[in-house]
Amino acid sequence: HEKDVSVRFVDKAENIGKPDLIIIKKKKNTIGDLIFLGERDISKEILKLSRHGMMIIGICGGYQMLGRQINDPDHVESPNDGIHGLGLLDIVTTFSREKQTYQVKARMLEHGHLFPVDNELAGYEIHMGETTHNGHNSIRPFARITERAGKMVDILDGCVSASGNVIGTYIH
């Protein structure tokens, strides 16, 4: 417990206020959660705050929501073939039926405004699908996974926007 830290869950745009940071995560399913954010105008508020430099972090499904598009060709989460994301990161996610679950260790590559470069991170990945970007310089990888399920690897994870205030990662 940190004395100067408080966390709030928000279900309406007007309840966001002026936080130091917004964390977006998946609650039930990514597409349904993205629809929920749109129906409650939370998406619009997140976009507005991002334009003003607010730190936005998307974890797992939240990372996927930050992208341009989520494709669901096998209808894993939805009867729809896909949905437009928030567009804060130039990435596209395509769902698959296979769930990936791994314990991981990683090193930070980009700090945005919060994380020291080369800081070690331990956590886990649990997601369905693959996220790709178009290779433009508008985003940079967030971390380098060095160990996955007890095996040494060299895998880039997540991304940081060019402005440094939007970060996405699969690492919980």
Predicted features, each with a name:
Residues V7, K12, Q103-I171:
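C-terminal and late-domain segments of enzyme folds
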Residues H1, I31, V160:
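RNA-binding accessory domains that recognize and position tRNA/RNA substrates
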Residues G17-K18, H52, A162:
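Residue-level preference for short coil/turn positions at secondary-structure junctions
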Residues E2-K18:
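A short, well-structured beta->alpha microelement
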Residues K28-A122:
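Cysteine-nucleophile active-site neighborhood
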Residues E14-I16, T93, E130:
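Residue-level detector of flexible, active-site-proximal loop/helix-junction positions
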